[in-house]
Amino acid sequence: MTAMMHRAVRCALVALLCVPTCVSAQDQSEPAGYRTEDYRAPTPATLKDARVVTTAEAEQIWRTSGAIFIDVLPHAPRPANLPPGTIWREKPRRNIPGSVWLPDTGYGALAPVTEHYLRSNLARATQGEMTKGIVVYCLRDCWMSWNAAKRILGMGYSNVIWYPDGTDGWAEADLPLRESTPEPPSSP
């Protein structure tokens, strides 16, 4: 081997050592409880007692109206310290057409009012049918949808479908997205 080849091999080895190690979804195991921090990180490939679907499977469910789609992406509130009269433009949320947007319901710990919001909107969307299919999603690598799907299972719904690629996977497949608004808060 020439000196130049030795140098190239050494450089390649150093470069490999400098590359950070990535954790894939397959390496991520399910936690016993809810994820309570670092919500934008690789998620497990599974969710006990839920069906996990690909984009193609989610599309098939959507096209056949086989389930209710629940978007749990958080909603950024108007900043509390914004001076009166300041124009506040919300960032629009584009989600899967026909979805029910229940923001902030995927956090690891929910305030009682947020849990009531989730429960009452699920009851309304499913018409109280605990076996109705419920597809839960957010964005790819977002624990919000995993947490929300786990919580919905814990509420007694038996046909929970987790779509981990969310609107990222949907958009990549060139499927339609529509601007959405959150469901209004319900009375306690």
Question: What function would you assign to each model-found segment?
Answer:
Residues 15-23:
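Hydrophobic h-region of N-terminal signal peptides that target proteins for export
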Residues 76:
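Glycine-rich nucleotide phosphate-binding loop and flanking beta-alpha elements
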